[in-house]
UniProtKB/Swiss-Prot annotation:
Name of the protein described by the UniProt record: Probable transcriptional regulator ycf27
Organism: Cyanidium caldarium (Red alga)
Keywords recorded for this protein, A-Z: Chloroplast, DNA-binding, Phosphoprotein, Plastid, Transcription, Transcription regulation, Two-component regulatory system
UniProt cross-references to Gene3D superfamilies, sorted A to Z: 3.40.50.2300, 6.10.250.690, Winged helix-like DNA-binding domain superfamily/Winged helix DNA-binding domain
Entry's transmembrane regions: none
Pfam families: Response_reg, Trans_reg_C
DNA-binding region(s), chain positions: 82-100, 142-246
GO MF terms held by the record: phosphorelay response regulator activity; transcription cis-regulatory region binding
GO biological process, one term: regulation of DNA-templated transcription
Domain named Response regulatory: residues: 13-126
Biological role: Probable promoter-specific protein mediating the interaction between DNA and RNA polymerase.
Amino acid sequence: MRIENKQNKRQHHLLIVDDENNIRKILQTRLTLLGYSVSTACNGEEALKIFTTHSIDLIILDVMMPKLDGYGVCQEIRKESDIPIIMLTALEDVLDKVTGLELGADDYVIKPFSPRELEARIQSILRRIQTRNAKLKPYDNINLFKTGSLNIDLEKKQIYKNNELIRLTEMEFSLLELLVSQSGKAFSRSKILKEVWGYKLSKHEPIADTRIVDVHISRLRAKLEDDPTNPTLILTARGTGYLCRKLIT
């Protein structure tokens, strides 16, 4: 089912995937009131059908569902798209949380959750993407970097390794952009969460899970480094967080 607010000329189209009817209805109503166009699916197979026939900007994806679970949906979507995916999970085991991130999810929210928290996550991710796109100036050499077998073009959002195009998710690219554009500068995990994911990290905010950063760093290293176990581009700043080694444009 799709609901649109025609007053908003450029709506982001969200897909909510959850087998709990109450959750789908609550989120659809709240997100529609915020000006989003919303589609819903009650299982993984239905979600993939909607995804292939609509232009979706962000997916809210439950893990435990019939027919095809959230992990399977995430894997299928990542074969052809880098759109943001937020996982909803009632599983509190660390491995379960990390599994979704390793499969390509950008963030996760644990059930039961506050709708306001999820709304804030959605707004932060979409705002980050919009802000990044607005800031980049065309044909600006400062957005071009070459190191070893890598060519990084921040303006075109293209990364080539050995002349082969490397696909990154939106959040992977945002993380890489932060580190590369300020190469040589170390960022704490908390600072990365604030800059890339939009976490405010104030005393009123829920404590963010810094493993989100660690898993995304691992994913970037797996895609960009010749030897991910011995990285030469994205380095660990001992006692701090991460940094990109100093690059020259």
